[in-house]
Amino acid sequence: MITAEERRALLDRAITTYGAPAQMDMAVEETAELTKALCKIKRAQAGCEVTAAIGNVIEEMADVQIMLDQLRIIFHRSTEEVEEAKLERLKNRLDGRNNWQGSNLHKWIEKQFSTGGDGHE
């Protein structure tokens, strides 16, 4: 198994060898391949077809993860803070604190149409 230090060195080497622009292009390609694999899995019918499709999705997920790690190196940024904020937003949505039905905009629109208003006060 590769260590974290070996992984980082290998990713740095790939960026140095191929260049950041090429690795950004490769990230686009790999995400497109994952998209295609996910679309195919929804069409899979037979057991062996489903198993192969799942294997393909897992392989493409690994490729995308490797490219995401390279993008973090290229841009000298972690996604941790942004991920935390997005997960908090998702939690709020799931907990009903940030849903459409409870939003001020929804309430305003409902009020306008329920009272026959034209949206002007």
Region roles according to the model:
Residues M1-E121:
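Flexible "arm" and connector segments at domain edges
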